[in-house]
Amino acid sequence: MQLVLVRHALPQRIHPADAPAADRPGGPADPPLTPRGEEQAQRLVGALAAEPVAGLYTSPLTRARATAAPLAAALGLEPIVVDDLREYDADAAHYVPVHEMPRLDPAAWERMRAGLLPESVDVGAFTRRVAAAFEGIIAAHPGRETAVVVAHAGVVNTWLAQLLGLDRPLVFPLDYTGITRVLAGRDGRRVVRTVNEIAHVADLLTPPAPTPAPPRGDAARCSP
């Protein structure tokens, strides 16, 4: 079978500098898509709607579910939410899109560029979680079926690194709504066919003008 892995579209920023403390929602950050992200999600319809998709799966996070929604409507499929597809920092109180990380958190950006997850992440546990999620989806689609999975850069990268025997989990730059394909054989073989197809969305990948940086010392958790 074929797994079509899609990174979510561009979400909004959630940062301490964006609103007074009294106006900030409590709990983990779970941002919706930006208008640009909504357009990116619509582009997935043209990229994938003609394929024989038998199942559509998504992370529980809003940015992934919103990305999957237009494709689900075009395919006439109800997305299946898989909790183990959530990103490694799903419980963080802040979310900063990756193109703003060099300004807002240079140390985290350099760690990501080095291919490393944050020090706070149990890499082994995260790898096992996402691998189990993907293998469960594979098991549900035997033969020559195709399933689409909308998730996150860390989730997709970590599984690819495991499949390819790489020693660092964040190896591939994955753009918003970039498409990666993995072929899964009944004999257990997994073949990475393509990584980060972006022809459908190339003109929407130039980062928007960054918002003003917060005051020095007001740190935020940044995410892919």
Give the ranges of each region predicted by the language model.
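An N-terminal RHG(E/S)-centered segment typical of histidine phosphatases
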Residues: M1-A54, A69, A73-L77, H94-Y95, ...
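Phosphate-handling substructures
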Residues: P31-P32, A74-A132, R193-T194, L205
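Glycine-rich phosphate-binding loop signature in dinucleotide/nucleotide-binding domains
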Residues: A49-P52, I137-E145
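Short glycine-rich phosphate-binding loop at a beta-alpha junction
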Residues: P52-P60, T146-V150
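Active-site signature of alpha/beta-hydrolase-fold catalytic machinery across serine-
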Residues: P70, T158-Q162
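GST superfamily/GST-like fold recognition
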Residues: A153-N157, G185, V191
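Domain-level recognition of soluble alpha/beta enzyme cores
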Residues: D167-R189
